[in-house]
Amino acid sequence: MPRSQKNDNFIDKTFTVVADILLKVLPTSIDEKRAFTYYRNGMSAQSEGEYAEALQNYYQALRYEIDAYDRSYMLYNIGLIHSSNGQQSKALEYYYQALDRNPRLSQALNNIATIYHYRGEQALINNQDEISKIFFDKAADYWKEAIRLSPTSYTKAKNWLSVRNK
């Protein structure tokens, strides 16, 4: 089950060592340990661009993880992978699932807004002005909420909103 760390990043190695120690000393259930190990392996694979392996690990982690907050990050990362693979609709599904479990996950709100903004841009290119307005309005709503939750983040979104008088 443990994944070998190919990454030479000091912070990643330190995290792995600390996580392994914590898993051994903290009073956690076997399922919690399995969930965390799969999640950590998923993050490692994802950081190395091994998306299929990362997805397998995240799906396994979801089988064992019961905490909604922790599940939200697993679902969010699955959404990131689908987005990276150009599967925007599938990414949206996972971002929404992440938000259902953790409504304060501003990163998911930002990514949803980004997808809607992209769809708005595509509609403009195809001379679908009314459809583009719908997507841009959705993007604005999600960015506003992301900014409300994380006021020091999302500078480009703030600028876009101010230009559009939103």
UniProtKB/Swiss-Prot annotation:
Q: Which GO cellular component does the record give, naming just one?
A: chloroplast thylakoid membrane
Which regions does the record annotate with the repeat TPR?
35-68, 72-105, 120-153
Question: What is the stated purpose of this protein?
Answer: Essential for the assembly of the photosystem I (PSI) complex. May act as a chaperone-like factor to guide the assembly of the PSI subunits.
**Gene (UniProt):** ycf3
- Give the membrane topology, semicolon-separated if more than one: Peripheral membrane protein
Q: Which InterPro entries match?
A: PSI_Ycf3_assembly, TPR-like_helical_dom_sf, TPR_rpt, Ycf3/AcsC/BcsC/TPR_MFPF
- Family the UniProt entry places it in: Belongs to the Ycf3 family.
Pfam families reported for this sequence: TPR_1 (PF00515)
- Write out the GO biological process terms: photosynthesis
Can you name this protein? Photosystem I assembly protein Ycf3
Q: Which UniProt keywords apply?
A: Chloroplast, Membrane, Photosynthesis, Plastid, Repeat, Thylakoid, TPR repeat
Compartments reported by the entry: Plastid, Chloroplast thylakoid membrane
Q: Does the record's keyword annotation contain Thylakoid?
A: yes
Cross-referenced NCBIfam families? PRK02603.1 (NF002725)
